[in-house]
Amino acid sequence: MSNQIYSARYSGVDVYEFIHSTGSIMKRKKDDWVNATHILKAANFAKAKRTRILEKEVLKETHEKVQGGFGKYQGTWVPLNIAKQLAEKFSVYDQLKPLFDFTQTDGSASPPPAPKHHHASKVDRKKAIRSASTSAIMETKRNNKKAEENQFQSSKILGNPTAAPRKRGRPVGSTRGSRRKLGVNLQRSQSDMGFPRPAIPNSSISTTQLPSIRSTMGPQSPTLGILEEERHDSRQQQPQQNNSAQFKEIDLEDGLSSDVEPSQQLQQVFNQNTGFVPQQQSSLIQTQQTESMATSVSSSPSLPTSPGDFADSNPFEERFPGGGTSPIISMIPRYPVTSRPQTSDINDKVNKYLSKLVDYFISNEMKSNKSLPQVLLHPPPHSAPYIDAPIDPELHTAFHWACSMGNLPIAEALYEAGTSIRSTNSQGQTPLMRSSLFHNSYTRRTFPRIFQLLHETVFDIDSQSQTVIHHIVKRKSTTPSAVYYLDVVLSKIKDFSPQYRIELLLNTQDKNGDTALHIASKNGDVVFFNTLVKMGALTTISNKEGLTANEIMNQQYEQMMIQNGTNQHVNSSNTDLNIHVNTNNIETKNDVNSMVIMSPVSPSDYITYPSQIATNISRNIPNVVNSMKQMASIYNDLHEQHDNEIKSLQKTLKSISKTKIQVSLKTLEVLKESSKDENGEAQTNDDFEILSRLQEQNTKKLRKRLIRYKRLIKQKLEYRQTVLLNKLIEDETQATTNNTVEKDNNTLERLELAQELTMLQLQRKNKLSSLVKKFEDNAKIHKYRRIIREGTEMNIEEVDSSLDVILQTLIANNNKNKGAEQIITISNANSHA
């Protein structure tokens, strides 16, 4: 077995390496320490099991953990005796005995070096790959060159001496990296970019799915893949390039393998779609485009623009005069009418479906909310991009109509069919914008789901650079649907967008420089104004007129105050004026001109200042008033609580008095019994003396108790009032420190205020004393209760609740007595007569 032991050096350490079926087992030459991890590997333990064994049995002994360096040398090293014990325990001692027993005597030959284990480095792999790729490229170049020579010779034989050798590849300046970079940019929409609006040229919008190229070339054309991949790159070419542009050798890894050059007709279509116009053909193409635009009305039935005539179509420039930033334009073919494909089967199916959809939208079934035809819920498969064709003169798509109508089933069906959520009408408005302009999604309660489908377009802008927030705010907060839409948008946008993007959306300026906050200010809309400010809209942005939202709101407030002052004089004679009061504002509608006037709840709702802090303080005045009202309510509750406590104390005093009287009576009875002599005669003089003494003692005790109770009541009242006064002083102090108040150094005024404060304190003490006296002075009332108790045989506790009944009984008895007296008087008079 000694032939299995070798010499090796790992991480600068000389070791003996024993070759085992599970791997190498190492022992250090300098101290005969053995790698315990290798022993556990020889015992066929898994890594997790090895770790547990090392922790329980090895690490508590003498050991050395080696981490880093050569991988095979790493592990937990232990002395030879511990290694032998470990091997014996796990039944591998016999297998590793040659390594344990091996010793090298002085002068003896060292074991042979361990066999080399080849580990290919990264440099070697790169060199191998580079050499293989170079050889493959050179071989491909030689094959391509031979094929070109053969093709050139065949062209001469066929009688085409001018045919140039064809080269495979893309024009100079177009690389695979540039195409990839462009592809990334094309996938980014306006909603993925920050504001301001990026300048994306129309020629850079992807049109890789256009039916024109596919149907024109057909499946037999071998250059379709080249054109579709090179279309973006060729847009970077200069128009001055010749039609026979210079080509360079193509990289084999880009996947393009066609050696066929595009035909002249196909090259012309390609140049027209990509904007690559050679100098020799520029005038010809312009002439063809002019002729095609003149005959574009009936040239293609694939792009309908109205529900009545789906066969009508216009050139792209006429169909989308204003288009916004949404990339729906990329889904509509960008080519002149002459190069449009002929009608296909899928085109006809989509046109029929759109026709049925328009008929349903304008029918009474839609208005009456009848059951939806099932055929409308199943658009033709593979209908994109035909499904995004305009269906009315304003270039709305079917998806625009479905979202505007709030018809969620149709909207979801079109969404699943692949319709573009960023399709725009003639004003550049997206389906989300159109949905927010009507109340249908509000009445049907479908706007949250529609917004969920279209949430990616919430940052898109139309041709006027207005967002969906602009469109909602223009409808004013007096419209319930507008309030509902804004609440949904602002609440759900937080789920997928950071705060800075929300603020960018709210502060987006249109072509007039107006943000949504400017529009709310122009409308005098306090509700929307405050909502947008709370969400992060800035009040300091100036529009093109140089006005901020604050300034516009102040102007609206001034006009409102003037108009309200005029209306107070005219209101008595104006019978056509209807006033509708809302919870937050007053809406005044004039039946003559439908003029809407919003008057504020208070001036602080409208007044704004150049300082944002001053504006916030002004608007917090209602909060201060509400806090004072809450404080008054709390004080009132405490007052009622104190009254209840005082009443309970009075009841306690009454019960104590009653007990005192009963005890006194019992005491007198006992004293009378004990003061009788043997003959049963009472000693009256002694009785009176004893009774008087007892009464004096009881009176003194009761007075002391009364004084103590009075003191307790007064202390409680003073303590509660002190707490309230301290709280009021603290609130006033905080309010004084928060608001910058000029210091008044007028000593005389301070003295007057101090004198007034002293008077108020004295008044408070006097009122407190009078309040305690009122509770104390109940002797007469108690006597009245005792009189009633003696006359009615009722308990004193029941007297207060029975006063009304007793009074009515006495009145009734009095009336009966008077009637009896009158009867007696009459009978006496008759008897005398």
UniProtKB/Swiss-Prot annotation:
Modified residues (Phosphoserine): S110, S326, S330, S827
Basic and acidic residues: compositionally biased ranges: 139-149
HTH APSES-type domain mapped to chain residues: 5-111
Superkingdom of origin: Eukaryota
Biased composition (Low complexity): 280-307
Organism: Saccharomyces cerevisiae (strain ATCC 204508 / S288c)
Subunit note: Component of the transcription complex MCB-binding factor (MBF) composed of SWI6 and MBP1. Interacts with MSA1.
CC annotations in GO: MBF transcription complex; nucleus; SBF transcription complex
ANK repeats: 394-423, 512-541
Modified-residue entries (Phosphothreonine), positions: T325
Gene Ontology terms: biological process: G1/S transition of mitotic cell cycle; maintenance of translational fidelity; positive regulation of transcription by RNA polymerase II; regulation of DNA-templated transcription
Function: Binds to MCB elements (Mlu I cell cycle box) found in the promoter of most DNA synthesis genes. Transcriptional activation by MBF has an important role in the transition from G1 to S phase. It may have a dual role in that it behaves as an activator of transcription at the G1-S boundary and as a repressor during other stages of the cell cycle.
Alphabetized SUPFAM superfamilies for the sequence: Ankyrin repeat, DNA-binding domain of Mlu1-box binding protein MBP1
Composition bias, Basic residues: 115-129
Name by which UniProt lists this protein: Transcription factor MBP1
Misc. remarks from the entry: Present with 521 molecules/cell in log phase SD medium.
Entry-linked Gene3D superfamilies: Ankyrin repeat-containing domain (1.25.40.20), Transcription regulator HTH, APSES-type DNA-binding domain (3.10.260.10)
Entries under InterPro entries matching the protein: Ankyrin_rpt, Ankyrin_rpt-contain_sf, HTH_APSES_sf, KilA/APSES_HTH, SWI6-like, Tscrpt_reg_HTH_APSES-type
Biased composition (Polar residues): 201-223
GO molecular function: DNA-binding transcription activator activity, RNA polymerase II-specific; sequence-specific DNA binding
Annotation: DNA-binding region: 36-57
Keywords for the protein's UniProt record, in alphabetical order: Activator, ANK repeat, DNA-binding, Nucleus, Phosphoprotein, Repeat, Transcription, Transcription regulation
Annotated segments matching region Disordered: 104-223, 280-329
